[in-house]
Amino acid sequence: MRKFFLFFLLACLSAAVAEAQPDFHAGFGGFGGAEPDFKDVNYAGDDLEAHRLDIYLPKTDGGSYKAVVAIYGSAWFSNNMKAITYFSLGKPLVEAGFAVICINHRSSGDAKYPAQIHDVKAAIRFIRANAAKFKIDASFIGITGFSSGGHLSSMAGVTNGLKDAEGEVGGNLTFSSEVNAVVDWFGPVDMSRMNKCETVNDEKSPEAALIGGAPKDNPEKVKEISPVSYVAKAEKLPKFLVVHGDADNVVPYCQSKFFSEELRKKGVLEEFITVPDGQHGPVTFNEDTYKKMTEFFKKEAGMK
Protein backbone atom coordinates (compact mmCIF):
# COMPACT_ATOMS: atom_id res chain seq x y z
CA MET A 1 0.00 0.00 0.00
CA ARG A 2 2.82 2.39 0.86
CA LYS A 3 4.62 1.63 -2.39
CA PHE A 4 1.41 2.23 -4.32
CA PHE A 5 0.90 5.57 -2.59
CA LEU A 6 4.43 6.68 -3.39
CA PHE A 7 4.05 5.59 -7.02
CA PHE A 8 0.78 7.48 -7.25
CA LEU A 9 2.26 10.59 -5.66
CA LEU A 10 5.27 10.58 -7.95
CA ALA A 11 3.10 10.03 -11.00
CA CYS A 12 0.95 13.02 -10.02
CA LEU A 13 4.00 15.17 -9.37
CA SER A 14 5.64 14.21 -12.64
CA ALA A 15 2.50 15.09 -14.55
CA ALA A 16 2.25 18.41 -12.72
CA VAL A 17 5.83 19.40 -13.40
CA ALA A 18 5.55 18.40 -17.04
CA GLU A 19 2.46 20.59 -17.41
CA ALA A 20 3.78 23.62 -15.54
CA GLN A 21 7.46 23.46 -16.53
CA PRO A 22 7.71 21.98 -20.05
CA ASP A 23 11.12 23.45 -20.80
CA PHE A 24 13.39 21.08 -18.92
CA HIS A 25 13.77 17.35 -19.52
CA ALA A 26 16.09 14.52 -18.45
CA GLY A 27 17.14 13.51 -14.97
CA PHE A 28 14.63 12.34 -12.34
CA GLY A 29 11.36 11.05 -13.74
CA GLY A 30 12.24 12.49 -17.13
CA PHE A 31 12.99 15.94 -15.78
CA GLY A 32 16.32 17.66 -15.41
CA GLY A 33 18.17 20.89 -15.65
CA ALA A 34 20.19 22.47 -12.88
CA GLU A 35 22.69 20.70 -10.70
CA PRO A 36 22.87 21.90 -7.10
CA ASP A 37 25.70 24.26 -6.23
CA PHE A 38 26.20 22.29 -3.02
CA LYS A 39 25.10 18.65 -3.11
CA ASP A 40 24.47 16.04 -0.42
CA VAL A 41 25.53 18.29 2.44
CA ASN A 42 24.90 16.56 5.76
CA TYR A 43 23.20 18.91 8.20
CA ALA A 44 23.25 16.62 11.25
CA GLY A 45 26.86 15.51 11.50
CA ASP A 46 26.08 11.86 10.79
CA ASP A 47 26.04 9.59 7.74
CA LEU A 48 22.28 9.30 7.23
CA GLU A 49 20.88 9.84 3.74
CA ALA A 50 17.88 11.35 5.50
CA HIS A 51 20.05 14.17 6.84
CA ARG A 52 21.34 15.52 3.54
CA LEU A 53 20.43 18.66 1.67
CA ASP A 54 21.12 20.29 -1.68
CA ILE A 55 21.54 24.03 -2.22
CA TYR A 56 20.73 25.80 -5.48
CA LEU A 57 21.89 29.38 -6.01
CA PRO A 58 20.72 31.96 -8.56
CA LYS A 59 22.94 32.35 -11.61
CA THR A 60 23.79 35.93 -10.75
CA ASP A 61 26.62 37.40 -8.73
CA GLY A 62 24.51 38.61 -5.87
CA GLY A 63 26.99 38.03 -3.09
CA SER A 64 24.57 36.30 -0.75
CA TYR A 65 20.95 35.31 -1.25
CA LYS A 66 17.88 35.18 0.91
CA ALA A 67 16.73 31.61 1.19
CA VAL A 68 13.79 29.24 1.00
CA VAL A 69 13.82 25.71 2.38
CA ALA A 70 11.80 23.28 0.23
CA ILE A 71 10.40 19.91 1.32
CA TYR A 72 9.06 17.06 -0.80
CA GLY A 73 5.82 15.19 -0.23
CA SER A 74 5.86 11.44 0.33
CA ALA A 75 3.22 10.82 3.01
CA TRP A 76 6.29 10.86 5.31
CA PHE A 77 7.30 7.48 3.82
CA SER A 78 10.50 8.61 2.07
CA ASN A 79 13.83 9.77 3.48
CA ASN A 80 15.49 10.66 0.17
CA MET A 81 13.39 12.63 -2.31
CA LYS A 82 15.10 16.02 -2.15
CA ALA A 83 16.05 15.78 -5.83
CA ILE A 84 12.46 16.19 -7.01
CA THR A 85 11.81 19.21 -4.81
CA TYR A 86 13.82 21.52 -7.03
CA PHE A 87 11.74 20.59 -10.06
CA SER A 88 8.40 20.89 -8.26
CA LEU A 89 9.03 24.07 -6.24
CA GLY A 90 12.64 25.20 -6.32
CA LYS A 91 13.18 26.23 -9.93
CA PRO A 92 10.85 29.29 -9.94
CA LEU A 93 12.30 30.40 -6.61
CA VAL A 94 15.89 30.27 -7.85
CA GLU A 95 14.84 32.20 -10.94
CA ALA A 96 13.28 34.80 -8.61
CA GLY A 97 16.62 35.31 -6.86
CA PHE A 98 16.41 32.99 -3.86
CA ALA A 99 18.83 30.37 -2.67
CA VAL A 100 16.81 27.16 -2.42
CA ILE A 101 17.65 24.46 0.10
CA CYS A 102 16.06 21.10 -0.72
CA ILE A 103 16.21 18.84 2.32
CA ASN A 104 15.72 15.19 3.16
CA HIS A 105 14.22 14.14 6.47
CA ARG A 106 13.72 10.85 8.28
CA SER A 107 10.73 8.82 7.15
CA SER A 108 8.03 7.39 9.38
CA GLY A 109 9.75 4.04 8.85
CA ASP A 110 13.02 5.45 10.18
CA ALA A 111 11.58 7.17 13.24
CA LYS A 112 8.23 8.34 14.54
CA TYR A 113 7.17 11.95 14.96
CA PRO A 114 8.60 14.38 16.15
CA ALA A 115 11.77 13.17 14.38
CA GLN A 116 10.64 14.77 11.11
CA ILE A 117 10.12 18.29 12.45
CA HIS A 118 13.33 17.97 14.47
CA ASP A 119 15.13 17.29 11.18
CA VAL A 120 13.57 20.32 9.51
CA LYS A 121 14.58 22.59 12.36
CA ALA A 122 18.07 21.09 12.41
CA ALA A 123 18.48 21.90 8.72
CA ILE A 124 17.43 25.50 9.30
CA ARG A 125 19.83 25.93 12.22
CA PHE A 126 22.60 24.40 10.11
CA ILE A 127 21.97 26.87 7.31
CA ARG A 128 22.09 29.81 9.71
CA ALA A 129 25.28 28.50 11.30
CA ASN A 130 26.95 28.12 7.90
CA ALA A 131 25.29 30.93 5.96
CA ALA A 132 28.48 32.62 4.78
CA LYS A 133 29.94 29.35 3.47
CA PHE A 134 26.86 28.75 1.32
CA LYS A 135 26.36 32.37 0.18
CA ILE A 136 23.10 32.69 2.10
CA ASP A 137 21.67 35.83 3.65
CA ALA A 138 20.12 34.29 6.76
CA SER A 139 18.13 37.43 7.58
CA PHE A 140 15.32 35.73 5.63
CA ILE A 141 14.61 32.02 5.50
CA GLY A 142 11.23 31.04 4.13
CA ILE A 143 9.90 27.51 3.84
CA THR A 144 7.64 25.68 1.42
CA GLY A 145 6.59 22.13 0.69
CA PHE A 146 3.92 20.04 -0.94
CA SER A 147 1.67 17.38 0.63
CA SER A 148 3.51 15.97 3.68
CA GLY A 149 6.20 18.55 2.93
CA GLY A 150 3.49 21.19 3.21
CA HIS A 151 2.61 19.73 6.59
CA LEU A 152 6.20 19.98 7.80
CA SER A 153 6.56 23.49 6.39
CA SER A 154 3.43 24.61 8.21
CA MET A 155 4.57 22.86 11.36
CA ALA A 156 7.87 24.74 11.19
CA GLY A 157 5.94 28.01 10.99
CA VAL A 158 3.43 27.38 13.77
CA THR A 159 6.17 26.17 16.15
CA ASN A 160 8.49 29.16 15.69
CA GLY A 161 10.20 29.65 19.04
CA LEU A 162 8.55 26.59 20.63
CA LYS A 163 11.28 24.78 22.54
CA ASP A 164 9.35 21.51 22.80
CA ALA A 165 9.40 21.18 18.99
CA GLU A 166 13.09 22.01 18.57
CA GLY A 167 14.96 18.79 19.20
CA GLU A 168 18.76 18.57 19.28
CA VAL A 169 19.56 16.99 15.91
CA GLY A 170 22.89 18.25 14.59
CA GLY A 171 23.47 20.72 17.40
CA ASN A 172 23.86 24.39 16.40
CA LEU A 173 21.42 25.11 19.21
CA THR A 174 22.56 28.71 19.59
CA PHE A 175 21.13 29.42 16.14
CA SER A 176 17.46 30.03 15.45
CA SER A 177 15.25 27.57 13.58
CA GLU A 178 12.54 30.17 13.02
CA VAL A 179 11.16 30.69 9.53
CA ASN A 180 10.10 34.07 8.16
CA ALA A 181 7.32 33.01 5.78
CA VAL A 182 5.50 29.80 4.78
CA VAL A 183 3.92 28.55 1.57
CA ASP A 184 1.89 25.41 2.19
CA TRP A 185 0.93 23.41 -0.91
CA PHE A 186 -1.99 21.11 -0.09
CA GLY A 187 -0.52 19.84 3.16
CA PRO A 188 -2.51 17.79 5.69
CA VAL A 189 -2.82 20.03 8.73
CA ASP A 190 -5.68 18.65 10.87
CA MET A 191 -5.28 14.92 11.36
CA SER A 192 -8.47 14.74 13.42
CA ARG A 193 -10.48 15.46 10.25
CA MET A 194 -8.68 13.65 7.46
CA ASN A 195 -11.50 11.21 6.72
CA LYS A 196 -14.20 13.05 4.77
CA CYS A 197 -13.35 16.25 6.68
CA GLU A 198 -14.96 14.81 9.80
CA THR A 199 -12.99 12.07 11.56
CA VAL A 200 -9.55 10.50 11.82
CA ASN A 201 -8.25 8.02 9.28
CA ASP A 202 -7.70 4.36 10.15
CA GLU A 203 -4.69 2.46 11.44
CA LYS A 204 -3.39 1.89 7.89
CA SER A 205 -3.13 5.59 7.07
CA PRO A 206 0.14 7.51 6.57
CA GLU A 207 -0.52 9.52 9.72
CA ALA A 208 -0.91 6.28 11.69
CA ALA A 209 2.55 5.25 10.49
CA LEU A 210 3.86 8.68 11.47
CA ILE A 211 2.71 8.39 15.08
CA GLY A 212 3.09 4.61 15.41
CA GLY A 213 -0.52 3.78 16.19
CA ALA A 214 -4.14 4.16 15.21
CA PRO A 215 -5.20 7.83 15.27
CA LYS A 216 -8.46 7.02 17.07
CA ASP A 217 -6.45 5.52 19.94
CA ASN A 218 -3.95 8.38 20.14
CA PRO A 219 -5.83 11.70 20.31
CA GLU A 220 -2.94 13.56 21.92
CA LYS A 221 -0.50 12.44 19.23
CA VAL A 222 -3.03 13.41 16.56
CA LYS A 223 -3.15 16.87 18.09
CA GLU A 224 0.64 17.03 18.33
CA ILE A 225 1.14 16.37 14.61
CA SER A 226 -1.60 18.79 13.48
CA PRO A 227 -0.35 22.31 12.68
CA VAL A 228 -3.85 23.71 13.13
CA SER A 229 -3.64 22.80 16.83
CA TYR A 230 -0.84 25.32 17.42
CA VAL A 231 -2.18 28.41 15.70
CA ALA A 232 -4.36 29.90 18.44
CA LYS A 233 -1.59 29.96 21.06
CA ALA A 234 1.39 30.58 18.77
CA GLU A 235 3.36 33.73 19.59
CA LYS A 236 5.73 34.03 16.62
CA LEU A 237 3.64 33.16 13.60
CA PRO A 238 5.06 34.18 10.21
CA LYS A 239 2.85 35.04 7.25
CA PHE A 240 1.33 32.09 5.35
CA LEU A 241 0.27 31.51 1.76
CA VAL A 242 -1.86 28.38 1.36
CA VAL A 243 -2.52 26.67 -1.98
CA HIS A 244 -4.92 23.77 -2.57
CA GLY A 245 -6.85 22.31 -5.49
CA ASP A 246 -10.55 21.70 -4.93
CA ALA A 247 -10.34 18.34 -6.74
CA ASP A 248 -7.57 16.91 -4.54
CA ASN A 249 -8.36 13.23 -3.86
CA VAL A 250 -5.38 12.58 -1.58
CA VAL A 251 -5.43 15.41 0.98
CA PRO A 252 -8.97 16.77 1.35
CA TYR A 253 -9.39 20.37 0.20
CA CYS A 254 -11.12 21.14 3.50
CA GLN A 255 -7.77 20.74 5.27
CA SER A 256 -6.46 24.00 3.85
CA LYS A 257 -9.82 25.65 4.37
CA PHE A 258 -9.81 24.81 8.09
CA PHE A 259 -6.20 25.93 8.43
CA SER A 260 -6.68 29.19 6.55
CA GLU A 261 -9.63 30.12 8.74
CA GLU A 262 -7.46 29.78 11.85
CA LEU A 263 -4.56 31.69 10.28
CA ARG A 264 -6.94 34.46 9.23
CA LYS A 265 -8.13 34.85 12.82
CA LYS A 266 -4.53 35.49 13.86
CA GLY A 267 -3.96 37.98 11.04
CA VAL A 268 -1.18 35.97 9.39
CA LEU A 269 -2.92 34.62 6.27
CA GLU A 270 -1.63 36.34 3.16
CA GLU A 271 -3.98 34.42 0.89
CA PHE A 272 -5.75 31.09 0.53
CA ILE A 273 -5.58 30.14 -3.14
CA THR A 274 -8.19 27.66 -4.34
CA VAL A 275 -7.26 26.11 -7.68
CA PRO A 276 -10.40 25.05 -9.58
CA ASP A 277 -10.13 21.39 -10.62
CA GLY A 278 -6.70 21.28 -9.01
CA GLN A 279 -5.57 17.80 -8.04
CA HIS A 280 -2.80 16.58 -5.76
CA GLY A 281 -0.14 18.25 -7.88
CA PRO A 282 -1.56 18.34 -11.41
CA VAL A 283 -3.26 21.64 -12.31
CA THR A 284 -2.48 22.99 -8.81
CA PHE A 285 1.17 23.47 -9.80
CA ASN A 286 0.90 26.06 -12.56
CA GLU A 287 2.42 29.31 -13.75
CA ASP A 288 -0.01 31.46 -11.75
CA THR A 289 0.45 29.65 -8.44
CA TYR A 290 4.23 29.62 -8.87
CA LYS A 291 4.09 33.37 -9.45
CA LYS A 292 1.97 33.84 -6.33
CA MET A 293 4.55 31.90 -4.34
CA THR A 294 7.56 33.85 -5.60
CA GLU A 295 5.84 37.22 -5.21
CA PHE A 296 4.81 36.37 -1.66
CA PHE A 297 8.30 35.33 -0.62
CA LYS A 298 9.84 38.39 -2.28
CA LYS A 299 7.40 40.65 -0.45
CA GLU A 300 8.15 39.06 2.92
CA ALA A 301 11.89 39.14 2.22
CA GLY A 302 11.82 42.82 1.26
CA MET A 303 13.07 42.09 -2.26
CA LYS A 304 12.11 44.21 -5.25
Please describe what each predicted stretch is.
Residues Q21-G63:
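N-terminal cap/lid segment of alpha/beta-hydrolase-fold proteins
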Residues D23, G27-E35, A165, G170, ...:
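Mobile cap/lid helix-loop segments that gate and shape the active-site cleft of serine hydrolases
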Residues S64-S74:
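Short beta-strand element of the alpha/beta-hydrolase
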Residues K82-I101:
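Short amphipathic alpha-helix adjacent to the substrate-entry channel of hydrolases
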Residues K112-A132:
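Alpha/beta-hydrolase active-site loop
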Residues R125-C197:
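Primarily recognizes the serine-hydrolase "nucleophile elbow" in alpha/beta-hydrolase
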Residues L241-H244, D248:
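Short beta-strand/loop motif that positions the catalytic acidic residue
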Residues G278-E287:
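Catalytic histidine-centered segment of alpha/beta-hydrolase-like enzymes
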